[in-house]
């Protein structure tokens, strides 16, 4: 049985590979920030789960930000940040701004070039996270992410799919 979707872009015929996200990368998160390290008026926005994707209500010092950004995991431009508690699975594309994110509540998949971020963002919008079906637990653990199955085409096809849906999202946003 061929592993391909019913509907495809012209010119693509290869099978899609079945993988687990954990085979393609690892979960990364920022270093923990304690409440006494934040303020309402420092320089660098600190996003907690309640402000993720909107306006920050806490900030950290430039000095702490620069130190933690160098020493600990930090997203790269284009990485897809995921909320792991509250509204599980909400995503934000990291645009390269100086900002910091609440550890373990906001995570991203650190992966190699076998995965395209635009494709991954679309996958996140439809994924059924492994181990969460029917669960009352409102938490997405690293294991849930890493054990989740994903079907992936070639990176060229991933890019084409990702770009198509990004343009569709932009068009919809324009007309709202």
Residue ranges and their predicted role:
Residues 22-25, 35-66:
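DNA target-recognition patches
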Residues 14, 129, 154-155, 170:
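Loop/turn elements at beta-strand to alpha-helix junctions within RNA-recognition modules
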Residues 58-61, 135, 174-176:
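Short, tandemly repeated low-complexity microdomains enriched for cysteine and small residues
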Residues 8-31:
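Non-catalytic DNA-recognition/assembly elements of restriction-modification systems
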Residues 48-49, 59, 63-125, 141:
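A short beta-sheet element
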Residues 2-6, 78, 131, 146-147, ...:
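Histone-fold recognition with a strong bias for associated Lys/Arg-rich disordered tails
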Residues 5, 159-171, 175:
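Extracellular/lumenal glycan-associated surfaces
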Residues 84, 100-106, 135-159:
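A short glycine-rich beta-alpha junction/loop motif
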């Amino acid at each position: 049985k061929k592993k391909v979707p019913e509907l495809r872009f012209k010119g693509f015929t290869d099978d899609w590979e079945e993988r687990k996200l954990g085979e393609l990368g690892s979960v990364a998160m920022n270093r923990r920030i304690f409440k006494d390290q934040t303020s309402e008026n420092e320089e660098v926005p600190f996003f907690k789960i309640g402000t993720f994707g909107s306006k920050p209500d806490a900030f950290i010092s430039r000095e702490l930000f620069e130190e933690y950004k160098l020493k600990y995991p930090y997203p790269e431009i284009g990485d897809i940040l995921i909320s792991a508690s509250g509204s599980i699975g909400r995503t934000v594309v990291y645009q390269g701004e100086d900002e910091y994110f609440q550890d373990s509540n906001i995570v991203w998949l650190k992966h190699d070039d076998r995965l395209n971020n635009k494709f991954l963002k679309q996958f996140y919008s439809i994924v059924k996270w492994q181990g969460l079906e029917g669960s009352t637990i409102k938490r997405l653990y690293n294991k849930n992410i890493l054990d989740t199955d994903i079907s992936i085409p070639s990176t060229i096809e991933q890019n084409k799919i990702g770009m198509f849906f990004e343009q569709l999202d932009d068009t919809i946003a324009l007309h709202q």
